[in-house]
């Protein structure tokens, strides 16, 4: 089971609910839903891509792991 911090989980939910998602649209969604700046969005996206949760291919963000396979660390505690 993959564990995500609450903010990471909320970010991943944006992808799961809207994928496939152009990265520019993800930046706008993150700003509207999470109050994040562009740099924050790309930092978290990179982190989740490195962990094999999401992928960003050709500017399109999709998930590699289903929502059901991920647990929010806060709900696991």
How would you label these PLM feature ranges?
Residues 20-21, 54:
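Conserved hydrophobic residue
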Residues 21-30:
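Short acidic, hydrophobic short linear motifs in intrinsically disordered regions
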């Amino acid at each position: 089971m993959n564990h995500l911090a609450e903010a990471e989980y909320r970010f991943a939910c944006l992808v799961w609910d809207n994928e496939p998602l152009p990265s520019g649209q993800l930046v706008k969604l993150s700003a509207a839903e999470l109050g994040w700046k562009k740099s924050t969005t790309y930092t978290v996206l990179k982190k989740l891509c490195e962990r094999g949760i999401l992928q960003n291919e050709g500017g399109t963000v999709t998930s590699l792991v289903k929502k059901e396979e991920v647990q929010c660390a806060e709900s696991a505690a």
